[in-house]
């Protein structure tokens, strides 16, 4: 399957003050546990350690649907929502490229 055919999300979440570490660990553990993603990046804003950015690329449309309708997704969603200071921003995308940069 070509990368451009794989569904993905770009997600921004802001944890309640001081809960950034807990949010990061929960998101990382959940993504590892689900097995629905082929690759993901979790990043923390330099200026605000309670803001998480996540780029998640699913293995396929079906893997995304299966995860979103799973008990694990429901469980994680409830736990994550309880840690957030505001609703998350979630943008559905399809990757264009994910290539190593050849630095000479």
Task: Label the model's feature ranges.
Residues 15-17, 59-60, 94-97:
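Non-catalytic surface loops within mature trypsin-like serine protease
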Residues 29-39, 57-92:
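An amphipathic, aromatic/His-enriched active-site/gating alpha helix that lines ligand/cofactor pockets
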Residues 12-23:
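Short, surface-exposed ligand-recognition loops at beta-strand->loop->(often short) alpha-helix junctions
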Residues 19, 50, 63:
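Short phosphate-engaging motifs
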Residues 10-12, 55:
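Short aromatic/hydrophobic contact patches that present stacked aromatics
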Residues 1-8, 39-52, 77-104:
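Glycine-rich beta-strand-turn "strand-cap" elements at beta-sheet edges
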């Amino acid at each position: 399957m070509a990368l451009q055919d794989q569904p993905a999300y770009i997600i921004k979440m802001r944890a309640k003050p001081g809960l950034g570490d807990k949010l990061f660990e929960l998101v990382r553990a959940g993504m590892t546990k689900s097995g629905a993603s082929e690759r993901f990046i979790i990043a923390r804003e330099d200026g605000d350690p309670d803001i998480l950015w996540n780029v998640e690329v699913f293995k396929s449309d079906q893997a995304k649907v299966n995860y979103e309708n799973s008990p694990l997704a429901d469980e994680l969603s409830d736990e994550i929502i309880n840690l957030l200071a505001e609703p998350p921003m979630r943008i559905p995308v399809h990757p264009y490229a994910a290539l190593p940069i050849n630095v000479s």
